[in-house]
Amino acid sequence: MNNNHWLERTELLIKQQGLDTLQKAHILIVGLGGVGSFAAEFIARAGVGSLTIVDGDCVSLSNINRQLPALHSTVGKNKTEVMAARLLDINPQLNLTVIHEFLTPERATEIVTPKFDYVIDCIDSITPKLNLILSAKRQRVRLVSCMGAGGATDVSQIKVADLMKTYNCPLAKFIRKRLKNERIDSGIKAVFSSEIVSKDSMQRTEGLDYKKSFYGTISFMPAAFGLHAAATAINYLLKRPATP
């Protein structure tokens, strides 16, 4: 396997054809918090050849309980910078594009193009999330959108389903409503939890970064969401019919 010897266990499972498929793929991940950072890690370790990561945030002390780039030694650093170093240490041959910015409606339209084989949405605020979903839908690029991982602790209730069939998730409820206003009522995969959210863990904010509130979060729930998102993308790529 030459320089890809580190993927020998993966090759045993998906064979050389599977490795070649993933090597040729280009995935876009937007949001590198608790969900997106783990999704990026799993994508890189699977041997995906090209990856674009987008986030405009810096590591803060409150991120340490759940986010992969967050350590006491990385507080204040750009999440994209920390994750880029980590991903390239996993796979030095990774074709990595780093975009250090928050996703505006205009940039969502510019960034999401048919060159991507899959988009993983790990944004945790409504307006940018909606813009990313709409951009992927308009460009006909496959997407999985991660809903709220906060306020829950039962990983067995994490599911992947059509967004319009999600339930018990406050974030998904808002996104469903907004998408229906855009006349979109199917065709978007979502990672969500069916667990009833712990409302007493919610805290209001000043509306910074499009957020009006957030829920308390345990270490493993965002990572589990990222795992489901990465698996959804990778399994789709491996099962997709080969193009001539």
Annotate each language-model stretch with its function.
Residues 100-108:
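Conserved SAM/SAH-binding loop
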Residues 48, 53-91:
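Glycine-rich phosphate-binding loop and adjoining beta1-alpha1-beta2 segment
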Residues 35:
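Hydrophobic/small residue at the entry helix of a nucleotide-binding pocket
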Residues 2, 112-117, 123-128, 138, ...:
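Glycine-rich phosphate/adenylate-binding loop
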Residues 29-31, 54:
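Conserved N-terminal Rossmann-fold NAD(P)-binding element of oxidoreductases
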